[in-house]
Amino acid sequence: MRNKYLRRARVLERDFRAVLRCFAHDLPALTAAKMCGVNKNTTHRLYGLLRQRMVALAEAEARPFVGGIVEIDESYFGPRRVRGKRGRGAGRKIPVIGLLKRAGKGFAQIVPNCSKTELLRVVHGQVKGPATIHTDGWKAYDGLVWDGFKHHRVHHHENEFARGKRHINGIESFWSFAKTRLAKQRGVRADKFPLHHKESEWRWNDRRDNLYSLLLKETRSYPLN
């Protein structure tokens, strides 16, 4: 059985397209299996392959931010609360640093911690040339000015969320998007989180496009293995 979208698989092309449409609409794999009449194990496998392709696309499309206004924020993914743990990123949460260029694309990177060293490493890797950086008041952002950036803060701890054009609403919208879609998964294993994390980035950056058409064209040109 030949499938021009998928190598070495006994899946009808119409079934693949049906599962792909569900995946593009971000439906859970079990829901897709029921809607498409495809075995749930097969559907989970297809979702995994499509997720890996999304990650490859996200990495291929990533470009440094050159100049302009860049919003930076850190967030934490994982259990809502761990008994006895307090503070930023307490417990078993996974720290992620996010950057978003105004009127442009976003970029998020998993890090060991959100220390000043890690933050500056990610910033210097992603932001090139003179840029104006907007952050919250977290002390780890100290020193951006000394590294040649213009730096504006909004102090959330003082109930300040915007001062004119000074805000980080864009990257916070990305966090909301990512956490909402991950919540639909009803739990993601830590070893699978990097895939889901980059998938969220790609979906966010291409959210105004027809994801089904993009992925159909991609898998037609470069079939999944």
What are these regions (language model features)?
Residues M1-N225:
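Residue-level recognition of single "structural anchor" positions
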